[in-house]
């Protein structure tokens, strides 16, 4: 029996991803002028209608409608008939009491919750292979559309990759599904051949993988109606695409539209940074980290590390290495990862983790040596 595992990703024209990009573009606009802005913005798109709502506390105001228009124009789904409804309110005073101590070590979490971070040495990005392939496929397709090389294609797309792990030393691609919005008048044969030869094959070649026999391209036949005209989109509905493609657990909180006092986002970034540095330090082949918080409280209520039985040092030593080398309070996370900068729209498509096109702070490996030194000081060689 085959041992199969599947992951997926979506392009920047997918309705949910349109919303993520609008929400993060609005967040970036606030942070550009007031780095201490507290922002929680949600977007919904449906046909020619765009709804933007949320809570904000900032010294500045921004033109959220113009920001949304620019995002839609850039993707290719804006028209003069697009209408906008906005409802941006002030942040709740009850929440603000716990998170407005921006110069204090007592800066509390903006909400309760738990977050997971994960890393594996399966790829050079310290990411699972499946989600890495999916993100690279849709990213490459988007780049080719932008360069006007992928003819008749539009930005709403999805891909799904099934890997065969029957032989862990010889992982193979079992199935690829690729659905892409296209013009009504197009050459189907050329379109599908281009996808296979110019999108799928170059990505698989990068990982020394062969194209599978089963490749399903637009398996329903046509994909002429796309973007927000085919499906309603919402911010935060692609949380598995945003993270590890199902290879690791998820705390349930979405990222986009939230400033760094929302631990759903910054806590997940910190957990990823921890896990990646631990794996890079050769602590284990794969590691999952969980951090949990209470609203208004600075220190986490729990920290957990799971090495899946592949650890080279005891897990209690690994946990001590985390607690001694990483600042886990909201203020510590924001300062360590420099999260008050307008960097978030870049993260809103093609995955928040394992990215090579941007130097996100949570992807840095600047804690590897400190972790190694700590473990060695406890009497373990790695």
UniProtKB/Swiss-Prot annotation:
Residues 91-101 are annotated as: Flexible loop. SUPFAM superfamilies: S-adenosylmethionine synthetase. It is found in: Cytoplasm. Transmembrane segments: none annotated. GO terms for biological process: one-carbon metabolic process; S-adenosylmethionine biosynthetic process. Coiled coil: none annotated. GO terms for molecular function: ATP binding; magnesium ion binding; methionine adenosyltransferase activity. Its main location: cytoplasm. K(+) binds at residue 42. Mg(2+) binds at residue 16. ATP binds at residues 14, 156-158, 222-223, 231, 237-238, 254, 258. It is an enzyme of class 2 (transferase). It catalyses: L-methionine + ATP + H2O = S-adenosyl-L-methionine + phosphate + diphosphate. It comes from the Bacteria. L-methionine binds at residues 55, 91, 231, 262. The keyword rRNA processing does not apply. Homotetramer; dimer of dimers. Belongs to the AdoMet synthase family. Catalyzes the formation of S-adenosylmethionine (AdoMet) from methionine and ATP. The overall synthetic reaction is composed of two sequential steps, AdoMet formation and the subsequent tripolyphosphate hydrolysis which occurs prior to release of AdoMet from the enzyme. This is S-adenosylmethionine synthase. It comes from Mycoplasmopsis synoviae (strain 53).
């Amino acid at each position: 029996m085959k041992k199969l595992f599947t992951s997926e990703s979506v392009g920047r024209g997918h309705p949910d991803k349109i919303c993520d990009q609008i929400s993060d573009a609005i967040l970036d606009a606030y942070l550009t002028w007031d780095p201490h802005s507290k922002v929680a913005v949600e977007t919904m798109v449906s046909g020619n209608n765009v709804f933007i709502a949320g809570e904000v506390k900032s010294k500045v105001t921004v033109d959220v409608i113009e920001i949304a228009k620019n995002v839609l124009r850039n993707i290719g789904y804006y028209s003069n008939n697009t209408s906008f409804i906005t409802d941006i309110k002030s942040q709740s005073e009850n929440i603000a009491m716990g998170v407005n101590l921006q110069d204090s070590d007592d800066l509390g979490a903006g909400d309760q919750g738990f977050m997971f971070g994960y890393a594996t040495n399966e790829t050079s990005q310290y990411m699972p292979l499946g989600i890495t392939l999916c993100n690279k496929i849709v990213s490459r397709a988007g780049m080719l559309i932008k360069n006007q090389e992928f003819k008749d294609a539009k930005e709403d797309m999805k891909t799904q990759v099934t890997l065969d792990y029957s032989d862990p030393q010889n992982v193979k691609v079992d199935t690829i599904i690729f659905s892409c919005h296209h013009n009504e008048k197009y050459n189907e044969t050329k379109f599908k051949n281009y996808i296979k030869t110019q999108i799928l094959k170059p990505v698989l070649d990068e990982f020394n993988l062969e194209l599978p026999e089963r490749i399903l391209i637009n398996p329903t036949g046509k994909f002429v109606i796309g973007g927000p005209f085919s499906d309603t989109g919402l911010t935060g509905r692609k949380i598995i695409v945003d993270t590890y493609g199902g290879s690791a657990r998820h705390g349930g909180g979405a990222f986009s539209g939230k400033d760094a006092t929302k631990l759903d986002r910054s806590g997940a970034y910190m957990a990823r940074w921890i896990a990646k540095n631990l794996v890079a330090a050769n602590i284990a082949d794969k590691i999952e980290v969980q951090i949990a918080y209470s609203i208004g409280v600075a220190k986490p209520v729990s920290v957990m590390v799971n090495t899946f039985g592949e650890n080279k040092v005891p897990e209690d030593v690994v946990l001590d290495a985390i607690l001694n080398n990483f600042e886990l309070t909201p203020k510590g996370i924001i300062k360590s990862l420099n999260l008050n900068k307008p960097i978030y729209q870049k993260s809103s498509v093609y995955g928040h983790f394992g990215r090579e096109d941007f130097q996100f702070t949570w992807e840095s490996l600047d804690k590897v040596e400190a972790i190694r030194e700590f473990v060695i000081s406890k009497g373990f060689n790695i």
